[in-house]
């Protein structure tokens, strides 16, 4: 583990897995990236596609592009351990320059350890993409000067229990971000559309773009409804499903 202030050990990171793949969502879809998936999340979204990552593992699986497990890393682990693994993967595969921090929810990790990880990654020349549910506005200023790009998954009241105030919480989070940012809004069913309209207007007011309307995998949507929603505000709004669910390129 790393060392915090006054020589105290930095709490470790709950890493679920580290793997190489193509980005399947949002602005960088199709780009070769390394992914650090953390375990633990503050939400219980109905459409969550990685529910297993809510719970921690004793050992994080480190996978190559083929899906082959290269090694296992004891959890919790130090930031320097994660960086060392990524450097080894880069030497083996040499096809990625971006590290995506995903989950779970990265911002529930011990702050000192997450900060150190991002700093070490950037020192190594990696671009850092932070994927967050944007529901923890108090954490926004902490990561604003660290991550190169922030991907905000804006939550709607219909996404899960006790989420009525989450669109406002997400907007408060984004108000505190000056780094490059883009937003995703997942559409699960018809109930999402009314809430999505309000979210789009709020994102437009903040100048956040591009905005990706993401039909949930397996859900059904009317083209006219998607067309109308995408044209609601004068901004860069696109409809883009999870490509990695259409073409299974996440190693397992």
Swiss-Prot record:
Its EC number is 4.3.99.3. It catalyses: 6-carboxy-5,6,7,8-tetrahydropterin + H(+) = 7-carboxy-7-deazaguanine + NH4(+). This is 7-carboxy-7-deazaguanine synthase. [4Fe-4S] cluster binds at residues 41, 45, 48. It holds the Pfam family Radical_SAM. Binds 1 [4Fe-4S] cluster. The cluster is coordinated with 3 cysteines and an exchangeable S-adenosyl-L-methionine. It comes from the Archaea. SUPFAM superfamilies: Radical SAM enzymes. It comes from Methanopyrus kandleri (strain AV19 / DSM 6324 / JCM 9639 / NBRC 100938). S-adenosyl-L-methionine binds at residue 104. Keywords: 4Fe-4S, Iron, Iron-sulfur, Lyase, Magnesium, Metal-binding, S-adenosyl-L-methionine. Its cofactor is [4Fe-4S] cluster; S-adenosyl-L-methionine; Mg(2+). GO terms for molecular function: 4 iron, 4 sulfur cluster binding; carbon-nitrogen lyase activity; magnesium ion binding; S-adenosyl-L-methionine binding. CDD domains: Radical_SAM. InterPro entries: 7-CO-7-deazaguanine_synth-like (IPR024924), Aldolase_TIM (IPR013785), rSAM (IPR007197).
């Amino acid at each position: 583990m790393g060392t915090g202030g006054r020589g105290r050990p930095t709490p470790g990171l709950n890493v679920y897995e580290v793997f190489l793949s193509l980005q399947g969502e949002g602005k960088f879809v199709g780009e070769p990236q390394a992914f650090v998936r953390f375990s633990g999340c503050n939400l219980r979204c109905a459409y969550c596609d990685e529910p297993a990552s809510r719970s921690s593992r004793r050992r994080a699986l480190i996978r190559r592009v083929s899906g082959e497990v290269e090694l296992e890393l004891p959890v919790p682990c130090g930031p320097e351990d994660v960086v060392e693994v990524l450097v080894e993967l880069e030497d083996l595969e040499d096809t990625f320059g971006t590290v995506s921090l995903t989950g779970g929810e990265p911002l529930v990790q011990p702050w000192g350890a997450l900060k150190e990880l991002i700093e070490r990654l950037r020192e190594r020349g990696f671009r850092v993409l932070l994927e967050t549910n944007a529901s923890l506005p108090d954490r926004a200023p902490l990561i604003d000067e660290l991550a190169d790009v922030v991907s905000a998954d804006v939550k709607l009241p219909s996404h899960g229990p006790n989420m009525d105030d989450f669109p406002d919480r997400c907007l408060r989070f984004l108000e505190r971000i000056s780094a490059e940012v883009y937003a995703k809004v997942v559409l699960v069913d018809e109930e999402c559309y009314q809430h999505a309209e309000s979210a789009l207007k709020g994102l437009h007011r903040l100048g956040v773009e591009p905005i990706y309307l993401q039909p949930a995998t397996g859900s059904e949507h009317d083209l006219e409804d998607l067309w109308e929603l995408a044209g609601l505000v004068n901004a860069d709004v696109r409809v883009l499903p999870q490509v990695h669910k259409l073409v299974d390129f996440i190693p397992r």
